[in-house]
C-alpha cells in the first residue's frame, strides 16, 4: 500500500487529504478517488491538470509512497498580461 497526499486550494479554502492506495495506482486514478470534486463543486477531476511536488505530470504517472498530488487551477490571466497591468498601475 502507498500513502499519498492530495491537495487542492482556492484563495479562501484549501484541502489536504491523505489516502491509502494500491501499488501501481496512477495520479489520475488517485485524483478521481479522492472525492475532492464533492467538496469543490466546480472542480472537474477528469480534466484538471495534476502535478507531484510542483511538477506537472501525465495522467498515467504511477504514484510512489509519500507523493503529494497537486490539483492545479487554470490561470485566470496570462502572467505577462498581469505583469503589464501591474507596471501600468505603478506608473499612474
From Swiss-Prot:
Organism from which the protein derives: Neisseria gonorrhoeae (strain ATCC 700825 / FA 1090)
Gene3D superfamilies membership: RnfH-like (3.10.20.280)
Domain of life: Bacteria
Gene (UniProt): rnfH
Entries under InterPro entries matching the protein: Mopterin_synth/thiamin_S_b (IPR016155), RnfH (IPR005346), RnfH_sf (IPR037021)
Homology family: Belongs to the UPF0125 (RnfH) family.
A Pfam family assignment: Ub-RnfH
HAMAP family per UniProt: UPF0125_RnfH
Organism phylogeny: Bacteria, Pseudomonadati, Pseudomonadota, Betaproteobacteria, Neisseriales
Protein name, UniProt field: Protein RnfH
Amino acid at each position: 500500500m502507498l500513502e499519498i497526499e492530495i491537495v487542492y486550494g482556492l484563495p479562501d479554502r484549501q484541502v489536504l487529504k491523505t489516502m491509502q492506495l494500491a501499488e501501481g495506482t496512477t495520479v489520475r486514478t488517485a485524483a478521481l478517488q479522492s472525492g475532492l470534486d464533492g467538496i469543490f463543486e466546480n472542480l472537474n477531476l477528469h480534466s484538471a491538470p495534476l502535478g507531484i511536488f510542483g511538477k506537472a505530470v501525465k495522467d498515467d504517472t504511477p504514484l510512489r509512497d509519500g507523493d503529494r498530488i497537486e490539483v492545479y487551477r487554470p490561470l485566470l490571466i496570462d502572467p505577462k498580461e498581469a505583469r503589464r497591468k501591474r507596471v501600468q498601475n505603478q506608473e499612474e
